[in-house]
Amino acid sequence: MSWKIQVCLIALLVLIGGNAANGQGKRKVIIDQDAAGPGGTDMQAILALVNSPDTEVLGITVLTGDAWRDEEVQHTLRLLEIIGRPDIPVLPGAVFPLVNSKEYMLGWEKLYGKQVYMGAWNFAKGYAVHGPYEIPPMPEGAPKIKASEEHASHFLRRMVRTYPHEVTIYAAGPMTDLALAIADDPEFAGLTKELIVMGGSINPTTDDPEFALSPTHEFNFWMDPEATRAVLHAKWPRLVLTTVDISVKTRMGKELIDEIRKSPTPAAQYVTKYAEPNILWDELAAVAWLDSSIITKWKMLYLDVDVGHGSGYGNTIVWPEGRQPGLGEIEGEVQDDLDKEKFYREFVELMARPTPRATKNEK
């Protein structure tokens, strides 16, 4: 190799390194999450995206889902303190669905039977029953940093206007914040780069009581069906879905927890302290976005949600090409199978690695 070529290669490497150090070339993402905590699938998905050296997390928008919004905001802020990323803004979003409510679902249960899981409405974390604006004692300690005063839907709209066609929206909770953004700005969806969704259920192979007898009834879709429908009818440049069907093929077991425990980083110690054996619902959606080669099989399907107020309220509806009704539903890339060993390996690496510091563009 001639000295001229060597000099050119060195200059190229320096340029690439400089761009990476300045945050250039990173994938911009907004995390829209129902961030129950401490630990668990919501927080571990946030960690995967924040800990990746290839992402620029513009902000974390938080709405009611697995827990009430204000409680989730506090857990998110505390997580960011623990891992040394207090610079990432946390934006409070929707407290309640557009139409659905706990009272409505209690009435629905009298007609159609008990729900297995109701998120904030059945207090799955075992805390004492509390109202939507109360914060129970936090096992990890209360945060010192504060959430932004900007509303999540406004932030979502502002970011896609600031970075048109560059921002990925990662949505792993109910769709209320996105529906509000769409209602306020009809061009919002088209100005994003893509929408990555953890939600929906088609025909999963599982003995999980939540889905074994009600295979299309998935929480993120049914908690706010009207919002889900608005999102699934918006004109996203690309729509990717991690449904229950593929999620139930994964598991956060003792072996993964023990592997993560070997790392001394604050992120790893946080994960192992609060980890619970469970399906890696949101983590799969996050890691598969970071490395799409984890997914080995896809289906192209048109999707919608049942907004009729009967037994199927909130259920996922799908059609293959040619059978969709043509009422505005769009086609999505539905993940169908994965390389589990590769996913587990990359998930452990993301949980265990040191959290990247904010670049000057991110501060």
What are these language model-derived features?
Residues 1-6:
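Positively charged n-region of N-terminal signal peptides that target proteins for export
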Residues 7-17:
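Bacterial N-terminal signal peptides
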Residues 15-26:
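Bacterial Sec-dependent signal peptides at the C-terminal "C-region" and cleavage site
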Residues 24-78, 85-86, 128-241, 247:
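Active-site histidine-anchored catalytic micro-motif
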Residues 25-27, 44-52, 56, 219-363:
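Conformational coupling and interaction surfaces
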Residues 88-146:
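Surface-exposed loop and adjacent secondary-structure segments within mature catalytic domains
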Residues 94-99, 176, 199-202, 243-252, ...:
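Glycine-rich beta-alpha junction loops
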Residues 104-112, 209-214, 256-258:
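Short, surface-exposed amphipathic charged segments that create phosphate/polyanion-binding patches used
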